[in-house]
Amino acid sequence: LLVISTIIDFTVGQKLYKCQESKNKKRWLLLSMFSNLGILAVFKYYGFFVESFAPLASIFGGNIDYLHLNIILPVGISFYTFQTMSYTIDIYRGRLTPTKKFIDFAVFVSFFPQLVAGPIERATNLLPQIVKRPMPSKSQIEKGLVLIITGLFKKVMIGDAAGRIVDHIFLQPDIYKSPELLAALMLFSIQIYADFSGYTSIARGTAKLLGIELMKHFEQPYLSQNITEFWRRWHISLSSLLKDYLYISLGGN
């Protein structure tokens, strides 16, 4: 699937750049959108939707016969799907010139440090760095090692430790009192942050060792004073991508 998405969007990028007519450009862009979102919908959300709507239909006397698919969720499908779509959208908007080398685009799509857990990098930021093939500076190596160590600490020492306590309490919640359950919920929120933030720190640190700069993914979200600020500081790459490519396109500001 990664190879299919890479081939489709590399080809679409070349066609978009060469197209002069607006109608044809839209057709190529739609090909990219439907291909990527279609693959994502089938492999990540097919089971969820059919298992959710089948019982709902039976309540109203309906009967939905759906195909049972033993789908194995591909690693990182959400991240590279949005990443390749940013490439074709930016070319369509005139913000990016497509890369001429397929290998450069393939590395951009499958860049291993951030493929599994992000951050979701835009083509305008990551692709030019890959094309230049930079050598890491001494500062990048030092900062990269610090990020990797910090990420491992957050993931193993905080996230995993909190997870063991949370799993133990959630396994038999009826034997615990309200304060203990409340503490477990708070620990669960810490576990989620430590896991995601830890993975991201490791990804950013590994990229620095390769001379590549990735964007921040989290900015101390639990110190936010309101929901809006929390949204801006949690999963930054996804929230900013949705704002720029969806919200503003629909008329937001």
Model-derived features: where do they sit?
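Membrane-embedded transmembrane alpha-helical bundles that form the catalytic cores
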Residues: 1-253
